[in-house]
Amino acid sequence: MSSAVSTTAAPEARSILAGAAEGKVIATTEALSFWGGVDPATGKVIDVHHPLHGICLTGGVLFMPTSRGSCTGSGVLLDLILTGRAPSALVFCEAEDVLTLGALVAAEMFDKALPVIRLDAETFSRFSRAAHVSIDQNTIKADGVSLAIAPPATAHLDLNDDDRAMLVGRDGIAVRQAMRIIVAMAAQQGASALVDVTQGHIDGCIYASPANLTFAEKMADMGGKVRAPSTMNAISVDKANWRAQGVPEDFGDPAARLADAYVRMGCKPTFTCSPYLLDSAPSAGESIAWAESNAVIFANTVLGARTAKHPDFLDLCIAMTGRAPLSGVYIEENRRPQRIVDVALPAGIDDAFWPLVGYLAGKAAPDCIPLLRGLGAAKPSRDDLKALCAAFGTTSASPMLHIEGATPEAGLAPLETAETVTISLQDMAAAWSLLNDGPEEVQLVAIGSPHASLEECRALAAVFAGRKRRADVAVIVTAGQQVIDAAGKDGTLQSLKDSGVQVLPDLCWCSISEPVFPTKTRALMTNSGKYAHYGPGLSGRAVRFGSLADCVESALTGRAVSRLPVWLS
């Protein structure tokens, strides 16, 4: 693109959601997950690894390329809008769905407008350097420069008779509202049609903010029911035991009500962030509608199913109609690798290698689908891939990746424009240090982010080998009820209990709160790259990262291993 601004070129500014706003510019070149990255109670950035850490977004015009990470960011933004703590406008230079959906729901269901604008990269860079920006329906202004804003896209959307009937209210006001939101999102995504989905996975059941409950109960009260069979993500409490665990009523009650609202709408109370472990897991080529970032990435990458990374709230809308915008990775051409990442494979790796590589792969491909090369000889297990996908989702906005020799669609030809980058051993050592900046002394070991599989539970019991944790170090595993039941049948659960391990259903590390999260904890140890990234912001505690064996060592000694792993030394 020329450095000069042309009046004959395609519009440089596109309105995604119209509105008027002004404020100081808050700019970053790094995407941010609003869930786990922004405190809905204050509007401050809490992601300790992000350049904007500590900045309050309230009232500012936020310039960032796109969002990343959690699908729950839409709920956080909706809550910020409803409480008056949101940025005054969002300005992107790449496609973005999660925050856009939150702003769309605010406008559609609560009559609260927050402008969302997309600029070309050059204009984005120029305007992001301004001190103050103002936006109205037709223009964006900064530093004496005024740029016309093109209206929202109005591409033709081919609806079938059933779609149109839902849109005019045949199936009630809740379905009509759901279809209105789907059609609006399809327009901004450039979709020309909708696609049938066979199942959904609901992420909006996590009590990330009061807005999640407000939305769900409003849809339930309007008579909303899911049309596509839909599982539910982990929730924010142990549903049957939260009162006995001492969870305050003012948190436990709305968290439980939120889960109940989705069950009332026909969702299955699976309460797991690892739905790919359920018997209902989809097959290759199956079009589904999942939310929860790690699940979306695993479904596309490992199972070969097809799903966009649907934001919270859109997940329910699609489940209620059985229809999703036909865009993104629902289309085979859009599943091709857009970047090639050559990864160094050291000798003697352990399980910590995989989340570390996932974390770095997301940084290497923050906004596109990568093909990882060099890992096939290591023959990663499904749990290795699970850990990699979850960590990848913290640092990338992409809904999938490919791993040569390990994932089913890795043979898709990369785009002709795909560049090649590398992940070196030096990169791994630097990332290891980044995720291990806490003190050596730990009071908690956190396993199960995402929810642990039966094989992970067995592996943990095997490493403990009958030994018992230190009395002053809690060890907590979060897992889905189906996995816990299976672990109970084969003796694994009893072995873990004998070692002093607590196994909790329903909630996960991304939603756990005090006092279930041990209040005396100052630092914790985890084998999850995802929780190593989000944990400091979510819990306010320092985090150490390592292998499953490192976690058991910490449980036995109260100290994190203070060295690089042998395979990085």
Curated annotation (Swiss-Prot):
Which InterPro entries does this one have?
Acnase/IPM_dHydase_lsu_aba_1/3, AcnX, PMDh-L-like_dom, PMDh-S-like_dom
| Entry EC no(s) | 4.2.1.171
Instruction: Characterize the regulation of its activity.
Output: Inhibited by Zn(2+). Inhibited by pyrrole-2-carboxylate and its derivative 2-thiophenecarboxylate.
Entry-linked CDD domains = AcnX, AcnX_swivel
Active site residues per record: 70 (proton acceptor)
Identify the Pfam families for this entry. Answer: AcnX (PF04412), AcnX_swivel_put (PF01989)
Q: Name one GO molecular function term.
A: lyase activity
**Which reaction(s) are listed as its catalytic activity?**
cis-3-hydroxy-L-proline = 1-pyrroline-2-carboxylate + H2O
Q: Which UniProt keywords apply?
A: Iron, Lyase
Assembly notes: Monomer.
Role according to the record:
Catalyzes the dehydration of cis-3-hydroxy-L-proline (c3LHyp) to Delta(1)-pyrroline-2-carboxylate (Pyr2C). No activity with L-proline, trans-4-hydroxy-L-proline (t4LHyp), cis-4-hydroxy-L-proline (c4LHyp), trans-3-hydroxy-L-proline (t3LHyp), D-proline, cis-4-hydroxy-D-proline (c4DHyp), trans-4-hydroxy-D-proline (t4DHyp) or L-serine as substrates. Involved in a degradation pathway that converts c3LHyp to L-proline, which would allow A.fabrum to grow on c3LHyp as a sole carbon source.
Q: Which family does it belong to?
A: Belongs to the AcnX family.
**Protein name in the entry:** Cis-3-hydroxy-L-proline dehydratase
Instruction: Name the source organism.
Output: Agrobacterium fabrum (strain C58 / ATCC 33970)
Question: Which gene is annotated as encoding this protein in its UniProt record?
Answer: lhpI
